[in-house]
């Protein structure tokens, strides 16, 4: 009888640990993305304008494609 209780306690503790880990990781990722948002086309356009470049759609598409390929 005590073996079953030990196994049950172990399984319950494992499930609680998995659930707790999931929510902690989710909260961390949400705060990380809030502090460091991913770059989109509008941000690239603004960066290029600040550097004195005239942002063409072709150049923006090339930069986005290069960034997406680098992230993989």
UniProtKB/Swiss-Prot annotation:
InterPro entries: UPF0154
Bilayer-crossing regions: 4-24
Subcellular location: Cell membrane
GO CC aspect terms: plasma membrane
Topological category with respect to the lipid bilayer: Single-pass membrane protein
Record key words, sorted: Cell membrane, Membrane, Transmembrane, Transmembrane helix
Keyword Transmembrane helix in record: yes
Pfam families: UPF0154
Family that this chain belongs to: Belongs to the UPF0154 family.
HAMAP family: UPF0154
Name this polypeptide is given: UPF0154 protein RBAM_017710
Species the sequence originates in: Bacillus velezensis (strain DSM 23117 / BGSC 10A6 / LMG 26770 / FZB42) (Bacillus amyloliquefaciens subsp. plantarum)
